[in-house]
């Protein structure tokens, strides 16, 4: 086939697809017409095609800013696989030798390279800025744009320097893309990238094929996980743990129980990490047990379950990680284990960080706890968090809708909670408020004399989990 004449022909010619998904065509047209373009699209919606196709069709080199070396490598390999020459796409980062960098620059100068993937750190290097000023650029793509926002779940300070650097290189259209952005994060991204007038394309964040469930974390969690895996014989799944040690221990436990599982975390040597990732992609193992270092840019469409061993640090992170299930449209089970103890542990980890970071971290954690303890439809809660309305009363595909929790009258406990907070002059955390209400004679409560308050022990007989839920709400 000769060079494609229109977008549909180009889509078929380069990617083999017969039609665009969702907003893809309108997004590409917006960018090719020279408009700044902001894309909010859930995981699996086809974000990368929104900048890859125009990059192949437009004159010059597109600068694609991406946070992870592994992510860049995967995307460059994928583009080279559909192109006649490897020179069409390159990445520029700290893993390259001087000779390799010189070759990349030569290919760009010779007009062969349509896509250059760079980490923000590489983009800000003086010699790279100088070089990029001398080449024709088609547009800039900022992938994983939520990294710009302090309110995002994966804030990276170097992302804040992108706009000033773009201004130094050359003014061209910018496309910013993310799979997770609350209205607050969206505003922050647009402000920081100077994209207030950008054309906004927002796809629905609803993933109807995903089943959401939150379980109380108990002493038999490892056995429960084995049962979940055995319910999906020969199928792929991801288990997320917060600590590297837990990743190693759980992977070993699953192996001992004759399950095909491998660990993945940033502390492993890169060769083992890559080998384990490839084994998962090539279906030589069924389960990958990982920290959140795993998954960004991993395109495995048939993941059937995602388990969170620990409650995630934010709902954005939860949405992105669960979003790795069922990308082929088939079923995806998302099961999260939750305990108030985990929450306290995570709050402790935050101590020692800058105050503003602690405050944001605690707020994000609070939102996650509210989600876990809520009796409302999980889908409704999640979509509301991302600024989207869900009008159905029952989604039929979450634990709260399939087995509605018994409604309990909480008016008296709520009044007692407000009275306790008032008696403590609004100066103490939820855990302390609960201890006062339960009548616990801790050293702090005695030191402050709060065991003499009228409200001390006012909810001594109330179930602790119920009290937690009321205080959080």
Enumerate the language-model features and the residues they cover.
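C-terminal accessory regions
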Residues: 364-389, 397
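Short coil/turn segments at secondary-structure boundaries
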Residues: 22-23, 379-386, 430-436, 449
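Helicase motor core with emphasis on the C-terminal RecA-like subdomain
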Residues: 5-14, 18, 22, 26-38, ...
């Amino acid at each position: 086939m000769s060079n494609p004449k229109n977008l549909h022909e180009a889509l078929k010619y380069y990617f083999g697809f017969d039609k665009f998904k969702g907003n893809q065509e309108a997004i590409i047209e917006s960018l090719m017409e020279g408009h700044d373009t902001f894309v909010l699209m859930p995981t699996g919606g086809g974000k990368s095609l929104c900048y890859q196709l125009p990059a192949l069709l437009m004159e010059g080199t597109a600068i694609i800013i991406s946070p992870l070396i592994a992510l860049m490598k995967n995307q460059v390999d994928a583009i080279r696989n559909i192109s006649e020459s490897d020179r069409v796409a390159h990445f520029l980062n700290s893993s390259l030798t001087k000779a390799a960098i010189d070759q990349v620059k030569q290919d760009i100068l010779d007009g062969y390279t349509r896509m250059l993937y760079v980490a923000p750190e590489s983009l800000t290097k003086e010699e790279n800025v100088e070089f990029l000023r001398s080449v024709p650029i088609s547009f800039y793509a900022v992938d994983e744009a939520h990294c710009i926002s302090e309110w995002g779940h994966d804030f990276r300070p170097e992302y804040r320097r992108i706009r000033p650097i773009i201004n130094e290189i050359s003014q061209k259209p910018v496309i910013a893309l993310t799979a997770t952005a609350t209205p607050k994060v969206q505003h922050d991204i647009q402000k920081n990238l100077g994209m207030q007038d950008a054309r906004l394309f927002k796809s629905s964040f609803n993933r109807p094929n995903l089943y959401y469930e939150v379980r109380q974390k108990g002493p038999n969690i490892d056995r429960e996980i084995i049962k979940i895996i055995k319910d999906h014989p020969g199928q792929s799944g991801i288990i997320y743990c917060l600590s590297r040690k837990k990743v190693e221990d759980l992977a070993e436990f699953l192996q001992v129980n004759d399950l095909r599982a491998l660990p993945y975390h940033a502390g492993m040597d890169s060769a083992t990490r890559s080998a384990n990732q490839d084994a998962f992609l090539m279906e030589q193992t069924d389960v990958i047990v990982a920290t959140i270092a795993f998954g960004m840019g991993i395109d495995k469409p048939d993941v059937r379950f995602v388990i969170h061993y620990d409650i995630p640090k934010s709902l954005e992170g939860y949405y992105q990680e669960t979003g790795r299930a069922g990308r082929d449209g088939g079923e995806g089970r998302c099961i999260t284990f939750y305990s108030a103890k985990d929450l306290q542990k995570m709050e402790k980890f935050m101590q020692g960080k800058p105050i503003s970071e602690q405050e944001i971290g605690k707020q994000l954690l609070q939102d996650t706890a509210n989600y876990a303890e809520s009796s409302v439809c999980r889908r409704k809660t999640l979509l509301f968090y991302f600024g989207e309305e869900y009008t159905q009363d029952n989604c039929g595909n979450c634990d709260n809708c399939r087995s509605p929790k018994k409604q309990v009258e909480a008016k008296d406990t709520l009044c007692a909670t407000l009275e306790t907070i008032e008696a403590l002059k609004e100066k103490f955390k939820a855990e302390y408020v609960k201890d006062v209400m339960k009548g616990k004679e801790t050293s702090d409560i005695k030191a402050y004399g709060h065991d003499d308050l009228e409200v001390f022990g006012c909810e001594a007989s109330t179930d602790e989990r119920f009290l937690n839920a009321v205080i959080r709400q």
